Amino acid sequence: GTATLALASNGTGTSGLTELTLAPQTVNVSGSVYRLANAVINNAGTFSFGNVHVGDTVQQALSITNSAANDGYSERLNAGFGGATDGRITTSGSIAQLAAGATNASSMVLGVNTAAAGAVNGMATVNFASDGTGTSGLGITVLPSQSVTVTATIEGGVYRLASPVIQTAQPVNFGNVRIGTAVTPRALSILNSAPNDGYSERLNASANGTTGGVTAGGSFTLLAPQGVNSTAIQVGLDTSVAGNRGGAATITFQSDGTGTSGLGITALPSQNVQVTGNVYRLANPALNTPSVTLAARVGDAGPTASIGLTNSSPDVYTEGLNVTRGATAAGFTSSGGIGNLAAGQTSSLNAIQVALNTGTAGSFSGTQALAYVSTGAGTTSSPDVSVGSGSVTLAGRVYTPAVASVNTTPVDFGIVHVGDVVAARNVAVTNAATATALNDVLVGTINTGGSSSFSAAGDLGSGLGAGQTNNTSLNVQLNTSIAGIYNGAANLALSSHNADMADLPLATTAVALSATVNNYANPVYNRVTGDGTLSGGGLSYTLDFGEVVQNAAAGTTTL
């Protein structure tokens, strides 16, 4: 604004002259008046935290407004905490230069230290100042402090959470059990280890999920501090599948304020209960020898065959296999058995054997019965239980051996000439065995052992049955190329033969051979006297009289 000044010159004390009016002057006047900041705690009074848990984070921000008019002539507000009457009251934060008309509801926080249980009562002081920075420039003016009454605000008790402890020794071991066997569940012993001083909540617990072959169930609520529940929650083992069925059961815990803090339910960390147990399947017999065929000749030592079995299993979780013999078909005998054959193993070579009786010729058939048992010995210790039966098909043939009889007496080719063609001589043989239910046939060949004078050929083909004779297939031949007196033998290689066994060589006596091969007479002619000429030699000569006159006297020659 402006101010007009009336001016006069006054000589009093100087010139002594009378006052002289001077011309007036106008003065321009400028300036600003700033009001101080005005602090208002919007949520002053009681901060009611109620009942809280030990370890909870308990805090609340003050809402502070600079209520001075926002017209450009109000200073800004600073705020900060002073002291607190209870050491468990916590303060943090401050406010700087809060503009007129503005509110800060986050920077300054009041809280409670919940490290220990008990009641908390107290008061916190908030200091304020009006700050001219950026407005009046007049610096900082201290304003009256204000108190936030905490007596009612933080008067609730501080409660600790329930503290679960699983007392049952772990792992809970169910040992080895047979597949499908009902397993008695084991109850867990659970303690609420929180102190029983009136400031601890109660404990809720429930089974909630498993791994592996573990089962779990049950729950309880409101277990008092220092209380133990050893019946409500149980763990077990699912025995429907063989193998290592161990795993874990998850137990979910809650701290329940019902009847204590009134704070409702607070989730606590879950805990796992380790469970072990192995489930064994029953023995699984696999018959490796579904059939047996044996052959022998009457009077032989009885041939035997092994019956093999495997306890078939994909892993070690299989009980042992016992095998005992049942009825054995007529014509056969059996022996042996199998005891506690381990998973995946095959019986030893001679564990179970069947033998063919060789007292009577004939064909025999039937079965060998087997009984299978799963034994818990060494695994589950469960009682033996039948796992079925098996049957091995038996077939046996007992042959009466052939009996070789050589019917031909010594063969004499007589006296022949060198170069003669001499007919072969046959050697007759008979299978002299008595016909029975099953007979070998007689087979064989003939030879002369490399003789240069005699040779032999032929065989008995498919063989001679009991009582049959062959007098055409085996023969001997004389070599007449060289004169001489010859003796030799025809050897018979005869065997008892059937389709199931190796041939049985039969002893025979060689057939004696004899022959005389003579040269023809060999005349030699010489001309002694007479006509003509004589030529030639051996068996062919020519007497040549040359040319003669017809009707002339006959020529004569003496030889």
Task: Write out the residue ranges for each language-model feature.
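Feature for long, exposed domains in two main contexts
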Residues: G1-L559
